[in-house]
Structure formats: C-alpha cells, structure tokens
Amino acid sequence: MDFGITFPSYIRAYHDVKMAEEYGFTHAWFYDSQMCYSDVYATMALAAEHSRYIKLGTLVSILGNRIAPVTAHSIATINELAPGRVILGVGSGFT
C-alpha cells in the first residue's frame, strides 16, 4: 500500500520529506502556490537531493502561471536529480 503526504512548498521542506521517507511514506506532494510559498520546483529539487526513494510531485502545477516550456524544463531538471521519482500534476489551480 502506498501512502503520500502533502507539504507547502517552503524551501526547508526537504527536512520533512526526509523524515516522511524514514517513516515509510511513498509520495511527497507540494503545493504550487506562488503567492504563499517558495517556488515548487526549487523545493522539489532540494527534496530530491535529500531523499532516496520517495516520489515527488506537484499538487498541482498551475498551467496558467508558467509557459509550458518552462514547466517542462523545470520538471525534467528535477527528474535528472531523482530519476523515475517525479510526478507532474497539472491543473487550473485555485479550485
């Protein structure tokens, strides 16, 4: 059985992701709320560097806030740090 946990995208969330991984969580999800938290992709990159197996995903990346190539490049970069552990959740946001 898989268990996920959601975090606000604050830059030090990698500490919490590392702890979640130690407690057996399989997924860590991050809000993409640019006005409230740090950048979701910077947060995920740090989490990728400080974890080993937990999957990392956006919950959700708001398509209207960034042009598609920027989103694709950001998520591809994180996938280089954590191959096969990255999930891009997309949506309109604010729902």
Explain the meaning of each model-derived region.
Residues 1-8, 65-95:
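Flexible, glycine-rich active-site loops centered on histidine and acidic residues
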Residues 1-58:
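N-terminal beta1-alpha1-beta2 module of alpha/beta enzyme domains
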Residues 19, 41-46, 63, 70-72, ...:
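Generic preference for flexible, low-structure residues
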Residues 34-35, 61-67:
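Glycine-rich "substrate-gating" loop/helix at the edge of Rossmann-like oxidoreductase active sites
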